Structures are given as structure tokens and as C-alpha cells.
Amino acid sequence: MNTALLYRLLDVDPAAGPAELLHRSRAGRHLPHLVLSSLVRDGVRMGGAARAELRRAGDRAARYARLAAGLGCCTGVRAIGSLPLAGHYPDGLLRPVGTLDLVAPDEAALWQAVVRLVTDHPVEHIEVTLLGDRPHHTAVTVQWPAEDPLADPWYRVRLTTAALPGDGRAVPVRPYLVAEEPVECLLALAESHLRRPALPPAPITVLDVAALTRSSFEPSDTAAVLAAYRLAPEAAVLLDQAAAHLPLGPLAAVRAALAPELAAEHRRRSEATASPRGLTARHGTLLRRTVIRHTWDTARLLSPAPGTDLLLTPVADYLLTPTPATPTTRTAALDALRRWDTPC
């Protein structure tokens, strides 16, 4: 993994130089940080502005790592996806972490972590989604401004009780993720591909695969885990696409071991797609932020009227809808909330 690979992935002629590489990388919000860190490793001369941008990105990554460790100790949540993947990159190469993804063992742990974040940080946005009906899974995303909110992305932490949410149709929610860390990282990449199957892999995805080639994998066991989590087709496509840009190393044997798993998974998905039953996602429209309800372990669902579902959480209250709420629906929900309101 080196700057030459970045030139190829971003379709930049090396003769155009590092300034053009950095310019091209700015099509993505976080990729410039990876490019800058790679250029520093190469000894490329850069000015104060570029170094300050890289410093802020490094501070952001370190802060995410501290957040994950601290929340893990006090609530039991743990990081999946981007942050663990960053740990597989070579020293000095800064893998961007746009969103810190955390999976909680249960809803109580999730809300404990959310309360901790709201208490310790200037959180401005809290988004809530419920997956399924009853029982359901909860996903919460909190955001607050970066050190320089105009130049840098906001901090974004996504917490969920479903480690792998599936596609809502043929691939179900898989709430628990239990595997060796490199395999978990491969699962996370395959799950991401499940949600965008028609698109080519982003440069960062190819780089993630390159980082994982530095780890060891037992081919048959890894393929069996990917199949058990219903992600054999996505993993196969992901590795095939990455192979067009770099040697797969130990992942080449994993790709070969996936071949016998593909037909069975495609058959299961065809059978599941034939059924009209799917997973409903209900998104919360914020009605109001509240004083933190420290005595609440979980959220509460209220249905004061047909078609009006309210979600009262330890930090805010929401109207739940499968589609964006209209102003009329929101006003009716606020009226219903006031009627049901009691001291918490």
C-alpha cells in the first residue's frame, strides 16, 4: 500500500504530481487525509495549511479511538467497521474514519452510550431509526461540530443494536458479530457492499482490502463465516474488484474457498425475495430534545392515535414514520405528545 496505488485508484497521472493527486482526492470528504499522510511518508514538502489539516485529521482519529475505548469500558459497546479497519493500515498512513460505528449488546447499553455522548459533547443532531416492528432493533446517530466546522466534517457516532442490518429484503438483520478481528473487518466491508451492489468499489474500500492482506486468514474457516453471515456473494465480488488493482495475498485463497458457497446463498435470496414480507425501517422525526431521563434504560413506544407512533427516548422524543413526516402530521404528533406528557 503506497502512493503509487493512490495515483492508480484516483486515476491521476503520476507526472501530474502530488498537488493534482490531493486535488482529485477532495472529491471525497475524508480521502485527502489519507493522501496527505501518504505524501508525508514519502517526504513530500508541504506547507502549514496542509500540515494543519493532517494534524486535525489525526486528532479526530485519536479522539474516535478514545471515545470507543471509553464507551466500551462503561457501556459494553464496541467499534466495528472503519475504526478497526484503520488499525490494519501501515504505521503513519491515516485511514479516514468519517463515522464511528459502535454496536451495543442491547438497547439499554445503546442508550447509556448515547446519554454519555450527549453529556460529554456539544451534540446538535440525534437521529433515530427502528428496524422491524416488535421486537425491533434501534439505530441512533449523534453529531457535533468539528474543531473547524467549516473546513472539517462533523463528528459522527452511529450506535446500533444490529451489527449487520441486512438489506431489508433477502438478507436479514444479524445482530451479533463474533469472529476474529480481520474477519470482522471483511464482514463489515461485505455488508457495506450489500447496500450498494451496483456501484464500483470506492477507492477507500480497495485500500481497506489492501490493508487486510497484511493479516493472515484461514481460507475455509473465513469462507464459512462469510457464508454463515449471508455475505458470501458480496465478499466474492469485493475481492474480485480489488484484485483488479492489487495482489490479494492471503485473501486469494479465501476467494477460492467462497466459490462453493455462492449458489446456496443466491438460492436463499431468491426464495426470500419471493416472499412479500420485508423489514420495515421507521425513521424518527425529532419533536423535541428533553432533559436527560437518567432513570430510563430503554425508549418507550406510544400510539395515542391510529397512524401516530411516538418514540420517547432518554434524550429526545420522536414521531416514527416510514416516510418523511408532513407538517400537519408533525403538529398532530406534538399535540398528542403534550396530552401524554408526564414528568419523567
What role is predicted for each listed range?
Residues 1-98, 104-344:
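Conserved NTP-donor binding/palm subdomain of two-metal-ion nucleotidyltransferases/polymerases, i.e.
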